[in-house]
Regions:
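Active-site clefts of carbohydrate-active enzymes
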Residues: 31-35, 253-255, 259-261, 305-336
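Catalytic domains of carbohydrate-active enzymes, especially glycoside hydrolases
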Residues: 52-79, 83, 205-210, 282-286, ...
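Substrate-binding cleft of secreted/luminal carbohydrate-active enzymes
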Residues: 66-77, 285-295, 331-411
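Active-site neighborhood of glycoside hydrolase catalytic domains
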Residues: 190-312
Length: 542
């Protein structure tokens, strides 16, 4: 009898282990929540803030792959009344600014004033508490050098510090002319101490699991030519000390996450020696990320992974909201298939986690008049950021297996942030000369067997290039189609791509006459049984 019981127990254990093995492995997903979005979206949707509604923001993410919520508590204005910076309440009551009469009482920020002064609702305390109840780690996020509206004489985003201390701006040797010239100069001790003092006060007030130091709002922290990695590393040591002191008081770890430019060289040229921060254990999570113009589908995640080797720092590449392949064209919102494609590529390149920026909720999403994410070029319900769509892909993005197996698109984009003396690389328009191959590279990650692959080229005039190869494998021309959404107005030439096992697609284009290309993407679709193969490929598996 004892032997039978032991065998039965062992059999049950094996079944449990088999079930665990079959369950897709989940990775952490960090989601940054903007400091103004709650007020802007609730005001637009006509939502009245109550404690339950405030907590409901966090409850929406239960059952998704979001493991960490990073609540922005300051850009240039603080989210709550404090002893260091002006708050939204201060701006609401302001009547004079920069020698001019102002009134911000009809602005959507009045929602925050009502919550704090009339209802007694501390949204950050409620969000932190509800996050823990929901099994989500709560963080406080700090934008270190935001510069929205700095060329306007008055703004609800201007602190008095900005007006009173022009000597603290990064460009003082000439008249300010560029968007970032009025950013603050971190070589000035008063600038650094002001930020550290605010972080210290917020960590004393709130029991957060971590702090995000967001250097991408903005990276322009020094006068041109005076970028100092030593100054920034010393600053990060101070942040680490504040986090460790908070951890000692709270009895749990308080981690440090930093958001930096997409590639290590650009980060260093701006003064951010992220590799040194990792070596010194000053940070726990590193987020290389584009600035804003477009998602970067060619993040050097594999290079960052090598730099962080043996440091224990978690690598979480960042996804932006928008996508574009021409710096001078209006961008589009990412599509769900493009989000899957980006995630699959990042996991294949070595990402430990993923980070989402500008992906917010939308309480008015059911009504076209109140929805926050409106676009005249993309119908409601077709964008990845549309709330109903978010709630679907947020349940799969934490699984490398799920995003790799699903329908996904990989579009060639560009890097939107480069050192001051460099120029943004523009992939299009791209000229293909007769008889001279033109090369492109798409990071795709491994593609499972049983998939159809469609390479799509935007070609001016619509004449298909005579030869196209992917990873030295010849591709078959299938026909032309319209680009929807209109990433390009040129006809799209579609090619069937043979299966490949590499992590990236190196595309080689040859033409028997000069050609101009305006778009490139690769669509990965599951094979639909019972459909003519050529028709299936031309329709993209839809």
């Amino acid at each position: 009898m004892a032997v039978r019981r032991t065998s039965l127990f062992a059999g049950c254990c094996l079944l449990v282990l088999a079930g665990l093995a079959a369950e897709p492995q989940r990775r952490p997903v960090f989601l940054n929540y903007d400091d103004t979005h709650y007020a802007a979206s609730r005001s637009k949707a006509g939502v009245v803030p109550t404690e339950d509604e405030v907590r409901g923001l966090v409850r929406q993410y239960r059952g998704t792959d979001v493991t960490d919520l990073l609540f922005c508590i300051c850009g240039r204005i603080a989210g709550v009344t404090n002893g260091v910076k002006e708050s939204w309440c201060d701006k609401y009551h302001q009547t004079a600014e920069n020698g001019r009469q102002v009134s911000y009482t009809n602005h959507y920020l009045c929602v925050y004033r009502e919550m704090e002064e009339e209802l007694g609702l501390d949204r950050y305390a409620l969000w932190i508490d509800e996050a823990r109840r929901s099994g989500i780690r709560p963080w406080l996020s700090f934008r270190m050098n935001d510069c929205h509206c700095t060329y306007e004489p008055t703004s609800f985003l201007h602190p008095d510090f900005f007006h009173r201390h022009p000597e603290c701006r990064r460009v003082r040797h000439r008249a300010a002319s560029g968007y970032f010239d009025n950013c603050l100069d971190y070589s000035i001790a008063a600038v650094r101490e002001r930020e550290l003092k605010f972080i210290r006060e917020m960590l004393a007030r709130y029991d957060a699991d971590g702090v995000e130091i967001d250097w991408l709002r903005e990276v322009y922290c020094f006068a041109p030519g005076r970028e100092s990695a030593a100054v920034m590393t010393a600053f990060m040591r101070s942040v680490r000390e504040l986090a460790d002191a908070a951890a000692k008081r709270r009895g749990h770890a308080v981690r440090v996450l930093v958001r930096v430019p997409a590639d290590p060289e650009t980060a260093l040229r701006f003064g951010f020696d992220a590799a040194a921060w990792a070596d010194e254990k000053l940070v726990d999570v590193l987020v290389p990320c584009p600035r804003w113009e477009t998602t970067d589908n060619d993040l050097p995640t594999d290079l960052w992974k090598r730099l962080l080797r043996k440091t224990g720092v978690q690598l979480a590449p960042g996804l932006e909201l928008r996508i574009c392949d021409h710096p001078w064209k209006a961008p589009f919102y990412m599509l769900t298939n493009q989000i899957r494609g980006w995630a699959a590529a990042q996991y294949s390149l070595g990402a430990d986690a993923l980070y989402l920026y500008n992906y917010f909720d939308d309480p008015g999403w059911k009504n076209p008049k109140t929805t926050y994410w409106r676009s005249f070029d993309q119908p409601q319900g077709t964008k990845g950021v549309d709330w109903a769509n978010q709630l679907k892909w947020l349940k799969e993005i934490g699984s490398p297996e799920q995003v790799a197996a699903g329908q996904r698109d990989h579009m060639l984009t560009y890097r939107d942030l480069v050192p001051l003396w460099d120029e943004v690389r523009r992939p299009f328009p791209a000229r293909v000369e007769k008889g001279a191959p033109k090369f492109f590279r798409l990071a795709t990650g491994r593609i499972p067997a049983g998939r159809t692959l469609r390479l799509r080229l935007g070609v001016k005039g619509g004449r298909p290039p005579s030869q196209v190869f992917v990873n030295s494998r010849p591709c078959r021309y299938l026909g032309n189609e319209e680009c929807v959404p209109a990433f390009t107005s040129d006809p799209i030439c579609v090619y069937e791509v043979p299966p490949y096992t590499e992590d990236a697609a190196v595309v080689e284009v040859l033409a028997d006459a000069p050609a101009e290309l305006s778009h490139l993407d690769l669509q990965v679709r599951q094979i639909c049984r019972g459909t003519d193969p050529a028709k299936r490929l031309l329709l993209g598996g839809r």
